C-alpha cells in the first residue's frame, strides 16, 4: 500500500521561511520575470495575499472567462504575458475559451489555478476536476505543483 509522503512545513522547504507560503515563492518568481499585475479574485488565497505583499497589483474580474480575456488583452497591449488566477473546478472551466483563443492567436497567457489538496485528488472532493486533462487541449504547457519544493 502506498502511503502519501508527509507534506513539508515551510521551514523544511528550500527558499521559504516560517512566515512564507508557496504563494510567496510564486510571487517572487513572477517578479523576477517582470510581472507587475495579475487578474483574479480572492483565490488561490495564499497567492493573492502574497501578491499584494510582494508588490504585484491585482486587477479583479467578475467571472473567470472575463479574467482570461482581460489577461489576453493585457498581453496584446503590453507585449508581456497576461497572468490570470482562478479557483478550481467549475470556475477554472470558465478559462477554457479564453485560453483556447490565446493559444490559437499565439498570445502569452499564464493561468494559475487552485486545486484540491493532494490527499483529496481523485476522491470526488468538492470541485475536484482533472485540470491537467481540461487545459491540455488549450495550453502549450500544463503542470501541477505537487509539493512546495517545486
Give, region by region, the residue ranges found by the protein language model.
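N-terminal alpha/beta PP-like core and its mobile active-site loop of ThDP/TPP-dependent enzymes
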Residues: 2-150
Amino acid at each position: 500500500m502506498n502511503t502519501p509522503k508527509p507534506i513539508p512545513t515551510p521551514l523544511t522547504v528550500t527558499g521559504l521561511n516560517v512566515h512564507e507560503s508557496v504563494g510567496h515563492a510564486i510571487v517572487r518568481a513572477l517578479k523576477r520575470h517582470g510581472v507587475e499585475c495579475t487578474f483574479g479574485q480572492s483565490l488561490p488565497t495564499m497567492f493573492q495575499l502574497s501578491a499584494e505583499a510582494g508588490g504585484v497589483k491585482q486587477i479583479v474580474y467578475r467571472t473567470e472567462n472575463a479574467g482570461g480575456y482581460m489577461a489576453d488583452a493585457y498581453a496584446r497591449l503590453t507585449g508581456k504575458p497576461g497572468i490570470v488566477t482562478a479557483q478550481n473546478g467549475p470556475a477554472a472551466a470558465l478559462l477554457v475559451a479564453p485560453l483556447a483563443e490565446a493559444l490559437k492567436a499565439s498570445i502569452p497567457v499564464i493561468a494559475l489555478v487552485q486545486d484540491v489538496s493532494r490527499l483529496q485528488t481523485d476522491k470526488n472532493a468538492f470541485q475536484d476536476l482533472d485540470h491537467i486533462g481540461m487545459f491540455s487541449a488549450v495550453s502549450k504547457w500544463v503542470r501541477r505543483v505537487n509539493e512546495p519544493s517545486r
